[in-house]
Amino acid sequence: MFHVQKELGSHEAVIVALFEEEKTSSFVKELDKAFEGQLQVLLEEKELSTKKKAISKVHSLGKTNVKRYYFVGLGKKESYTTEILRAALGKAFKTLQAAKVQDAAILLDSFVTEKLDAIDVAHIAAEVQGLGTYELQTYKSDKKDRVELEKFTAITAEDTQEIEAALTVGYVHGRATNSARTLVNMPPNVLTATKLAEYAVELAEKYDMDYKVLEKEEMEELGMGALLAVNQGSVEPPKMIALIYKGKEEWTDVIGFVGKGITYDTGGYSLKPREGMVGMKGDMGGAAAVLGAMEIIGELRPEQNVIAVIPSTDNVVSGTAFKPDDVITSMSGKTIEVLNTDAEGRLALADGITYAKKLGANYLIDVATLTGGVIVALGNHTTGAMTNNEELFEQVLEASMETDESIWQLPIFDRDKERVRNSKFADLNNSPGREGHAVMAGTFLGEFAEDTPWVHLDIAGTSESSGAHDLGPAGATGAMVRTLATLVERFGEE
C-alpha cells in the first residue's frame, strides 16, 4: 500500500500542507504556474484556508497529472505540533475516504518544519490514515461496501528506506489501535472471557509469543480469590490470560502490562442504574489496550521483555454472586472487605498484578476503565495516572507525549493508604467512599504492586468517545495502545 517517491506522479489526490506564513511556498508557486496564476487568486480570496484543520479541495481540470489537490491548513508554524498534524491529517483522510479516493499521495516535505522532520510526518501520516478512516464493525444485515485507499505514496527528498520504515511503524500503530477499538465495541454476548482468551491466544501464536490461559481450577490452586469472587455470579468461566514476549536473551528488565478484562459490568449487587449500565461492554478497554500494544510489539519486535496479563470475567448478579460485606483473600494473601461490588475491576487487577509479578515482571503498568471519578477530575480527553516510581512514570509520560495521548498524574498520600487499609475485618477495603474515588482505586492497586515500580492508568474517560472526532467515529478510541507500545520501544533510553 505504501510507496516512497522523489517526484510527484499521476494520482487521484495529493495532500499538501498550507501554513499561514507560506502561502507562496516553492511548491505553491510551482503549482500556480500550472494553474496560470489562479491558485494565488484563491489564496488571496481566502478560498484556500490556512486555518488549522481546514481542508480545501482544488480540481486540476487536467492542468496537471493529479486530479485533485487537498490543501491542509495548519495555522502558524510557531504553534505547529504533532497533535495539530494528527488532527488535520485525520480530517484530510476522512475527506478522501468520503470521496472514495483509492490512489493518493502526500507531499511529505511540505509538512516538515524545524520541530517535525520527515520521519515524524511519515509515521503520523500512516498511523492517522488508519485511525481517521476506521469504521465501526457492525452486526447489521445490510452492510455497505467500503472503498479503501489502495495506494498511498509519500513524496519526499529524504532517504527512501528511512521513510518506508517510518510509514510501516505508523501503519502498525494505527492498525493495532483499531484492533483494540474493535474489541471494545464488540457486544458482551459475543466477547466473553473465553472469546477474549481465544483472541489473545491467536495473537500470541501469530507472533510466536509464549502464552498461558489459566482456568478456574488453576486459579483456585493459586489462590486468586479476588478475581474468582467477581466471577462468582457468572455462568461464564473466568480466564487469567498471559502473553509473554521475549525480546532479549536474558529474562531481565521485564515490563509487565496488566489490563482489566471485565467483559460486562452490571455492578453486581451494588447494581448500576439503567443509564449507567448501557455501554459497560467497554469495561475491558484496558485488556484491549494491552492486546493492541502486544500486536505492535509482536509486529515490530523490539529488544525488550514484556508480559501482558489480563484477568477476565463479567460482573453479574445471581444467587451465587459475591456481596457487600464479603471478605475475600487475594492471590497476594491480603484479605479484602468488599464494600462495593461495583468496585470489581480493582479486585480483578489485584490478582492480575500479583500474577504478573509471579511471572517475572520488574516493572508494572496497569490499564483500566476503572472509575467514574477520573472523568469528573480530568474529563474525557486525559487519562489519569498514579505511580510509586517517578522514573517509570516519566518514561510513560514521554511516550504519551510522543503519541499525543494526554495523561495527568494524580497523587498518592499516606492518608489515602490509610483509607484503603481501614477495615475491622480485613487487611483492605475495596471502596472507602466517593471522595477522591479515582485516587482510592489507584491507591488500592498500589497495595499489590508493593515495591515493584508501577504506573496505574485509568482510561475510564478516554477509552470511548461519545461522538465522531478527527481520529475516528464515536465509540472506542483504543486509548493507550500506542503509548504502551512506544514505552516499550523507547524503554531505558537516556
UniProtKB/Swiss-Prot annotation:
GO cellular component, as recorded: cytoplasm
Cofactor: Mn(2+)
Domain of life: Bacteria
SUPFAM superfamilies for this protein: Macro domain-like (SSF52949), Zn-dependent exopeptidases (SSF53187)
An individual GO BP term: proteolysis
Name of protein: Probable cytosol aminopeptidase
Catalytic residues as annotated in Swiss-Prot or TrEMBL: K272, R346
Keyword Membrane: no
Enzyme class: hydrolase
Family label: Belongs to the peptidase M17 family.
Function: Presumably involved in the processing and regular turnover of intracellular proteins. Catalyzes the removal of unsubstituted N-terminal amino acids from various peptides.
InterPro entries tied to this protein: Leucine_aapep/pepB, Macro_dom-like, Peptidase_M17_C, Peptidase_M17_leu_NH2_pept, Peptidase_M17_N
